[in-house]
UniProtKB/Swiss-Prot annotation:
The keyword Phosphoprotein does not apply. Specifically methylates the guanosine in position 1516 of 16S rRNA. Keywords: Cytoplasm, Methyltransferase, rRNA processing, S-adenosyl-L-methionine, Transferase. Its EC number is 2.1.1.242. It catalyses: guanosine(1516) in 16S rRNA + S-adenosyl-L-methionine = N(2)-methylguanosine(1516) in 16S rRNA + S-adenosyl-L-homocysteine + H(+). It comes from Desulfotalea psychrophila (strain LSv54 / DSM 12343). It is found in: Cytoplasm. One of its GO terms (cellular component) is cytoplasm. This is Ribosomal RNA small subunit methyltransferase J. One of its GO terms (molecular function) is rRNA (guanine-N2-)-methyltransferase activity. It holds the Pfam family SAM_MT.
């Protein structure tokens, strides 16, 4: 797990309001607010682009971005512009139909990419993230996107909560038509998770070793289905065979129906 992190502000963005918010973030994460970032191996740096998790050089305090959530540019921006159609596999997996958009609980929000795609397609999505740092980065990315007049309409479909998904579902799971899971799976050589961004996420949140318990809870409360994203060729969670699978190049969706509409 990542540790020994500070929150650092770029001087030119500092205002009274930003300083108040920065103190609230530091308190929530239980990390120091410091202008001596070179004393830490990692830092949440707040600059004109927003919040990003960075590695810090002990030699000169320079930084390299590790994680940054951007719903308007990069991969998410590309998907919004090019891939957001109901023909894509995730739309079929969660139960999107002509004239019908399911309510979706994303139990493993991560970088928020899949939840964002579903929001683009008109689904009401609740993103749940238990890692405080991932939650903070997500919150910052969502807030920045909401400042754009076009993106604000899409982001209105997204709700973000910081919680343990299993515990939340035990109390509120019946509110959702579809429960979506994309658990971190054990590391394998040559896995797509060897990409730097995903390695950092793994270090930050660890493997989802409780995914079997989460699936069990989800199956008892989902209104229509539970969708589990898995690497292609990976075993089913707890060897529980789904009702059907949607296979892609490197991954698949295991679809477990809890009722038939």
């Amino acid at each position: 797990m990542l540790h020994n992190i500070t929150l650092s502000l770029v001087p030119e963005i500092i205002t009274d309001n930003i300083l108040i918010k920065a103190k609230e973030i530091a308190q929530f994460l239980n990390i120091p607010l410091s202008d001596r970032r070179e004393e830490y191996p990692q830092a949440l740096i707040w600059d004109r682009d927003g919040l990003s998790l960075c590695s810090i050089s002990a030699k000169d305090g320079s930084h390299a971005k590790l994680l940054y959530i951007d719903f308007m540019g990069g991969k998410n921006g590309y998907r919004h512009a090019n891939d957001c159609t109901t023909r894509q596999p995730i739309a079929k997996a969660v139960g999107i139909k002509p004239g019908f958009r399911p309510t979706v609980f994303d139990a493993t929000a991560g970088m928020g990419g899949d939840g964002f795609v579903l929001a683009c397609l008109g689904c009401r999505v609740t993103l749940c993230e238990r890692s405080p740092i991932m939650y903070t980065l997500l919150q910052d990315g969502i807030e920045r996107a909401r400042q754009d007049s076009v993106m604000n309409k899409i982001m209105a479909n997204l709700d973000l909560i910081h919680n343990n998904s299993k515990q939340f579902l035990e109390n509120h799971g019946t509110n959702y038509h579809t429960i979506y899971m994309d658990p971190m799976y054990p590391h394998k050589k040559k896995s797509a998770l060897n990409k730097k961004e995903m390695r950092v996420i793994r270090d930050l949140v660890g493997d989802d070793n409780d995914s079997d318990n989460l699936l069990e809870t989800a199956l008892t409360v989902a209104g229509n289905r539970v969708v589990v994203k898995r690497p292609k060729g990976a075993p089913y969670i707890e060897e529980r065979k789904p009702h059907h699978e949607i296979t892609m190049k490197n991954s698949r969706f295991d679809v477990y129906l809890t009722s038939y509409l």
